[in-house]
A protein has these predicted regions:
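Long, contiguous interaction/targeting segments characteristic
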Residues: 1-2, 42
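Residue-level micro-sites within transmembrane alpha helices that shape
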Residues: 90, 203, 222-223
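C-terminal membrane-anchoring or membrane-association module
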Residues: 219-236
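Extracytoplasmic/lumenal soluble domains of exported proteins with redox or metal-associated functions
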Residues: 5, 138-145, 231-236
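Aromatic (Trp/Tyr/Phe) and Gly/Pro-enriched flexible surface segments
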Residues: 16-116, 124-133, 138-169, 173-200
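Short, threonine-centered small-residue motifs that mark membrane-proximal processing/anchoring sites
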Residues: 2, 7-20, 195-215
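Activation segment
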Residues: 32, 212, 219-220
Length: 236
């Protein structure tokens, strides 16, 4: 991913809020979307292979505003592009603002997005987070599985995917990689929208224990107060 380093987005101390989406232009709204599926500039991403952003309802059978997809969608979504078997967009996020928690083993990530395709064709999109150390060495990667034709019910649209896990100790950067793959037809109909990557704190073991104990006590108290299923018999 060395060629994408110029797109690194620093999560500075002032913006290192836990739970905040760190992907820039993850919703394809920064910039004008294409009205016919053609190539346009995609701000915030290092793009190869023709990946583009397209208006919902663009001519040519692209997803319409009423098709399956995010409820809070904007005007645009990502698409694979014209006459290309594979296209890619990469964004590199600097995790240095979280280094203390990450290196203490106290950080987890959430990766999510809406992925999809066209009609009964098998073109698809995938989203991957590749964690690297300060020297650029890959430590760990996690991907959202592509949405297949069956997942979409053979209809044009997008389906939500989500994954989370621990951020590896030593991680200083994360590459966010959006891949679009064409399997048939001339247009690469891998689609994606509302992509998100966020960092959260790992709950302390004591917090889980206290929560579990509280739930057990609540259940015990509830059982003690529960009346008999047959009701009480009045005294003779």
């Amino acid at each position: 991913m060395a060629g994408a380093l110029a797109c690194a987005i620093p999560a500075s101390a002032s913006t290192a809020a836990l739970g905040q989406n760190l992907i820039v232009n993850g919703d394809a709204e920064a910039g004008a979307g294409s009205q016919d599926g053609g190539a346009v500039v995609v701000p915030g991403w290092s793009v190869s292979g023709g990946l583009t952003s397209v208006n919902y309802g663009a001519s040519g059978g692209f997803p319409a505003p009423g098709d399956a997809g995010p409820q809070n969608r904007g005007k645009n979504f990502f698409a694979g592009g014209v006459d290309t078997p594979a296209s890619r967009a990469v964004q590199v996020i600097d995790l240095s603002a979280y280094s203390g928690a990450i290196n203490g083993g106290h950080s987890q990530f959430d990766l999510s997005g809406w992925l999809g395709g066209y009609s009964t064709q098998s073109d698809n999109a995938s989203l991957t987070a590749v964690f690297r150390d300060k020297n650029g060495n890959a430590l760990f990667s996690q991907s959202l599985a592509p949405v297949g034709v069956g997942d979409r019910g053979g209809l044009t649209g997008l389906v939500f995917r989500d994954s989370h896990g621990l951020i590896p100790v030593g991680a200083a950067l994360v590459d966010i990689v959006l891949d679009m793959r064409r399997t048939e037809g001339s247009y690469n109909d891998g689609y994606a929208d509302n992509l998100s990557f966020s960092v959260a704190a790992v709950p302390e073991p004591g917090s889980w224990a206290m929560l579990g104990a509280g739930l057990l006590m609540l259940g015990f108290a509830t059982r003690k107060r529960r009346p008999s299923a047959f009701g009480a018999h009045p005294a003779a």
